Amino acid sequence: MVTRTVVLSWPKDASTPDVITSVATPTKGVRHGYIVNLPDAVSSIRRSVELAEKESGITIKRAIFSIGGTSLSAENSNGSAIISKSDGEVSNFDIKTALTQAEEAIELKNRKIIFSSPVSWKLDGKDVPGKPEGMHGVKLEVKILSITCLAQHLDDLLSAAAEAGVEVVDVVPSSVAASEIALTDRQRAVGVMLVNIGAETVSIAIFENGVLIGFSVFPIGSTDITNDIALGFRITLEEAESIKTGSIMATSYPKRKVDDIIEARLSDIFELIDGYLKKIKRSGLLPAGVVITGGGAGHALVEGLAKDMLRLPSRVGAQELLSNMKGPVRDSSWFVSYGLAILGKENGESPRGKGGGGSAKGIFKEFLRQFLP
């Protein structure tokens, strides 16, 4: 498991940022996306910050963090508001009132909301395509999707960052951050799923009609593939990781057997994903298919197996935005970190949900890190 750190410069009026530096350092003290050893986690953050500062020549004080632990969950809720203006025109105040009521309807015992986004609107019982502001009616209703996290896990992350000397500007679900880079507006409109395969977790985000309609995290990841190879060949974890990534291959490790081991674990992953799609009635029904990112997305079997098991078009993410970036741009395993840059540039607001951070005035220099896979 690694901590990915990116330092970007985003010139005023530029459509894409310049990558100043991107570094990856070992992560300790984290299991399945949440902190299990606070001192080790603090050391991991501090080590990553120091290396990024050394390579970029920039002092890092503030950060946008991604989080993708197994304690994340998504829940739908509803809210409403009686239109406040005498002429019945829907105002931003009415919209905020309905959204607040929807969030307050969620049971938050031991949990905190880290992201929320409207799924649909109704005005006087009729569906409203797009934003309702400026329309006229009596009662506004909204359905939202909120992503929550165990309060203890979130507090541990904030504490670790503070002890490492870094101010947390915002915390964003990892697959939501990756979607900012990996998905197009057209894909979001017709229906698409982002699958982020991390070391110990797989997180998914489903979009339709331009909004987030589904989200889940599964306690399985590319580390499980490494463990399976180690058991299958009775070798060390280091050797197994090298075989998984293709950096070593010999006659003593038959390719067919390696592929069978990897395929079996990937099949488990896609079976879990399809189960969730069936739950939200989208199995085989996303025209823009599946876009796969993360450190576990690089194996040659991933695309074909996803296509067969999910019955959807599938590809490993490779958005044009990355090719337009200047500097040491990495592969799709870095999509979460780059996606945080898109969120952070929105002048203090997340473009598609609650949260966001950073300043977009002049040159945008921000420390972006993918700490929890």
Language-model features: locations:
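Nucleotide/phosphate-binding catalytic cleft detector across ATP-hydrolyzing
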Residues: V2-A63, I67-M193, V211-I213, S222, ...
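Acidic, glycine-rich loop-and-beta core segments that form the ion-binding/anion-interacting portion
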Residues: E180-I248
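Extended hydrophobic-aromatic, low-complexity segments
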Residues: G214-S216, T226, E238-A240, F270, ...
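A short glycine-/small-residue-rich loop at the edge of a beta-strand within enzyme catalytic domains
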Residues: S216, I220, L231-R234, M249-D268, ...
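Nucleotide-binding motor/catalytic cores of P-loop/tubulin-like NTPases across gene-expression machines
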Residues: V211-G214, I292, G296-L343
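Glycine-rich beta-strand-to-loop/alpha-helix junction loops that act as flexible
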Residues: F65-T70, I197, A288-G298
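Short, well-ordered secondary-structure micro-motifs
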Residues: N76, I181-L183, A205, L301-L305, ...
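Gly/Ser/Thr-rich active-site loops/lids in small-molecule metabolic enzymes
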Residues: E89-S91, F218-F233, V302-E303, L310-V316
